[in-house]
Swiss-Prot record:
Residues 374-390 have a biased composition (Pro residues). Residues 227-242, 342-353, 571-581 have a biased composition (Low complexity). CDD domains: CID_Pcf11 (cd16982). The lineage of its organism: Eukaryota, Metazoa, Ecdysozoa, Nematoda, Chromadorea. Residues 157-176, 188-198, 609-624 have a biased composition (Polar residues). This is Polyadenylation and cleavage factor homolog 11. One of its GO terms (molecular function) is mRNA binding. Disulfide bonds: none annotated. It comes from the Eukaryota.
């Protein structure tokens, strides 16, 4: 008992530390819940209590913790059953207290529950009914599937359901695929109710087999998108009763006209009393029809759901019920135009779209016109309809993608052992050429989540998976570098963990994200010899692509010739003899009409401008400014130039480093006033007046003295260029001394033991000594110090200390001699 209480207390303290959407803390809470499975009731109670007491901004975080526990804790556990009892009240409380952003996030959590088996569909239906009372825009899930999508064809709002009176009719023409939402479903979803409904269905199917077959014919199976496409559903429902009436009517003559009657609402099945003896069981051959048929594709009316036309199944071609044409002597008709003026025969698909659609009437009374030619024995070529067995092919899915802005260079190369290989594709197989043979490459690793419009789908690498995208099935699989994803055989380029892929599927935009980091790229060790004959073709295609990508350098011959003329390499054009000489030159500041500021007309240089300037003699030669040399284009030189880099750090990109900025170059060249002129170190703007400047300059002086030595020292800081006479005459001795000096071990830095030193400052320079511990002698010493006549000074200050001591001893001796008395 104590362990359970301590586990609940620890979990309460850890949950109270959750302040923001931190994935690490949420994972920690999930791991704790997995470790404390025995205290599952207490932990669920702690989570519920914290949800009701925390601030509204943290309620979403608590729901994230619940979602993580439900999805990640190992089975079996008691959390699923415990959360199922309280999830409706917890979700409703978080939804009621949250703002629009929190409600959107809660909806995303609810969508993920629909694709898993965490809760029963009835529980999700109860949750949706609760939230729908708070927000009418909240979609209600299907009690059978649990999906909470608004465009689910099996979902219908409660307001669209029919009244209870019509529901009691045994022959109500309802679709078998639709599920009408009833708020009383929760109370009625019991085994007893299910058995009762089963008996009712058996009773309705009990009348004879003939009525059962007629019922199947009378109630065709409707499409799930009938509610979205009212035009198609209306045409289907209006054609079925007419066919039944035609079948029940006695046929007196095979060519007798069948008059259409006004449509009536379908009667219940029990009200139809029909003499089965009057029905002919022999199937009569169809009467050839000469009436024109409209083969134009049916236009879909606009619907409330965007993009629903793309997923509407193509219905089989329905042959319209064409009445048999009456005899010529009985039924009047409008004669067709003569055959001489009629256009030549064309294919039905090319000819009939030009004709107006035939008028639809309730009967064949007045005003009925027939568009077919008269039925006479003249040989007229009838319009052939497509055979009954020929069906139009189903429309193929259309894919297109928008290139995302990736943070990686757009090339198809991979590096293996420091060597770059070009990735080539044979259909959807990625290969590289290695050792003259093709090797297949592919992604490998654990399964990844592919998020399509916020819905995750778990995919295995190198294994195609069928995914339902808005009612349409698509084969999706991971690809290879530069073609990371395939949907329906169409490649998409993306980045794992990067920006989303914007794909247009059947006219509707979708956002696709590749989650996680970049997967491992594996290379098959065995060459794919069956792809060897494709290598030459792929090489040629790659050369063509590279050649097409190279920009064509435009040569400006006009500016080149002008530069030659300004350098007096080319002679000036001959002056026209008819040109007037005594003309006043135009003002220099007035522009010539039709020219822009650059001296161009319509985008090209004016060829007559130098000739016009030459007419005014030498008085205006100084005003003739030669055209400036054209700057090299960024394409030709390969370097783009700009004035200044972008100011915002968020706009920075790796490609911006390839651009030459004039402001950056000027800043690097310009001499800074706040930098040291010797080393370039940046200091303050006091121009040498602050203590920082003075200390820095003193440091330079000390470095120079230590490097070159003082003026009084006789040591030479550098080696002489030419050897001296003694060194030249005795080379062996010099070599031996050099060898002896080289053999000497390096002496440690001199240092005086700090135990007996009273003042740890140099008596010459006044700086403090650096004290260190000597491990060899196990004592504390003063670094780089020497003892000069009882005074501890730096090694560099030893000469100055000795000189000062000699001077002081000389003065002391002279003073002593002066004080001695004379004998």
């Amino acid at each position: 008992m104590e362990s359970v209480e301590s586990a609940a207390r620890d979990y309460r303290e850890t949950l109270a530390e959750l302040r923001n959407n931190n994935k690490t803390q949420i994972n920690l809470l999930t791991i704790l819940a997995d470790d404390f499975k025995k205290a599952a009731p207490q932990i669920v109670e702690v989570i519920e209590r914290h949800l009701t007491t925390c601030s509204p901004s943290q309620k979403l975080l608590v729901m994230y913790v619940c979602d993580s526990i439900l999805k990640n804790v190992k089975k079996p556990n008691d959390y699923d059953a415990l959360f199922a009892r309280k999830i409706v009240s917890m979700f409703e409380h978080a939804f009621r207290q949250g703002d629009e952003r929190i409600r959107t996030s809660l909806y995303r959590i609810r969508v993920t529950w629909a694709s898993t088996t965490l809760f029963m569909p009835s529980k999700l239906y109860e949750l949706d009914m609760k939230i729908n009372k708070l927000d009418p825009n909240w979609p209600i899930s299907n009690p059978q599937t649990g999906r909470a999508l608004r465009d689910d064809p099996q979902v219908m709002a409660p307001s669209q359901s029919r009244p209870a009176g019509n529901a009691t009719s045994p022959a109500a023409s309802t679709s078998t695929n639709r599920v009408f939402v009833n708020p009383k479903f929760i109370g009625s979803s019991t085994p007893g109710a299910a058995s009762a409904s089963k008996t009712v269905v058996e009773k309705t199917k009990s009348p004879g087999t003939v009525n059962k077959e007629k019922q199947v014919k009378k109630e065709p199976k409707q499409d799930p998108l009938d509610k979205l496409l009212p035009s198609s559903s209306a045409s289907k429902t209006s054609s079925s009763p007419a066919g039944l009436k035609r079948k029940s009517a006695p046929s007196e003559h095979p060519n007798a006209p069948i008059r259409k009657k006004p449509q009536q609402p379908p009667k219940p099945q029990t009200a139809i009393d029909e003499d089965l003896r009057s029905i002919s069981l022999t199937k009569k051959p169809p009467v050839p029809s000469a009436q024109d048929q409209d083969f134009r594709p049916k236009t879909l009316k606009p619907t409330s759901v965007i993009g629903s036309h793309a997923f509407a199944p193509v219905a089989a071609p329905i042959r319209p019920m064409i009445p048999v044409p009456p005899p010529v002597s009985v039924a009047p008709f409008v004669p067709a135009p003569p055959l001489s003026s009629a256009p030549p025969f064309q294919h039905p698909q090319q000819h009939h779209p030009q004709l107006p659609p035939p008028p639809v009437h309730q009967g064949m009374g007045r005003g009925y016109h027939h568009n077919s030619p008269p039925q006479d024995p003249a040989p007229i070529v009838p319009v052939q309809a497509p055979p009954p067995q020929q069906h139009l092919p189903a429309p193929e899915n259309v894919y297109s993608s928008e290139q995302p802005k990736l943070d990686v260079p757009a090339n198809n190369r991979i590096f293996v052992d420091g060597k770059a290989y070009e990735v080539m594709f044979v259909d959807d197989t990625a290969v590289i050429e290695r050792g003259g043979a093709p090797h297949r490459i592919y992604f490998a690793g654990p399964p990844r989540n592919l998020v399509i419009d916020g819905i995750p789908h778990l995919l295995q690498f190198d294994t195609p998976t069928q995914i339902d995208i808005l009612g349409s099935k698509h084969m999706v699989k991971f690809g290879a570098p530069s073609r990371e994803l395939y949907i329906g055989g169409h490649p998409f380029k993306g980045q794992f963990g990067g920006p989303p892929i914007i794909a247009t599927i059947n006219g509707r935009r979708h956002e696709i994200r590749l989650t996680g980091s970049a997967p491992e790229v594996r290379i098959e060790p065995e060459p794919a010899y069956h792809l060897t004959h494709f290598l030459h073709k792929m090489r040629e295609e790659k050369k063509i692509e590279i050649a097409s990508e190279k920009p064509e350098k435009k040569e400006d011959w006009l500016s080149y010739l002008k530069n030659l003329r300004t350098r007096n390499i080319l002679p000036a054009p001959a002056r026209s003899p008819s040109s007037p000489r005594n003309q006043t030159p135009p003002p220099a500041n007035l522009p010539i009409p039709g020219m822009n500021n650059a001296g161009q007309r319509g985008g090209y240089h004016n060829r007559h401008q130098p000739q016009q300037n030459a007419r005014w003699g030498g008085a205006n030669k100084q005003q003739n400014i030669p055209p400036p040399p054209s700057d090299p284009s960024p394409i030709g030189s390969g370097v783009e130039k700009r004035s200044a880099p972008p100011a915002a750090i968020t706009d920075f990109n790796i490609r911006l480093l390839q651009i030459r900025y004039d402001s950056v170059v000027d800043a690097l060249i310009t001499k800074r006033a706040d930098a040291c002129k010797f080393c370039g170190m940046r200091l303050d703007d006091s121009q040498g007046k602050s203590k920082e400047w003075q200390d820095h300059m003193d440091w330079h002086v000390k470095q120079n003295l230590a490097r070159h030595g003082s003026n009084n020292s006789a040591a030479v800081p550098y080696r002489q260029w030419y050897p001296s006479t003694s060194t030249w005459l005795t080379p062996r001795a010099s070599d031996e001394t050099n060898e002896q000096e080289a053999d000497k071990p390096e002496e440690p830095l001199p240092g005086v033991a700090s135990s007996g030193v009273k003042t740890k400052e140099c008596s010459v320079c006044g700086e403090k000594f650096d004290e260190y511990y000597d491990d060899d002698e196990e004592t504390w010493r003063l670094r780089d110090t020497v003892n000069v006549h009882g005074k501890i000074v730096h090694s560099a200050c030893a000469s100055d200390a000795a000189r000062s001591l000699d001077n002081s001893s000389f003065f002391n001796d002279s003073d002593i001699k002066k004080e001695e008395p004379f004998d």
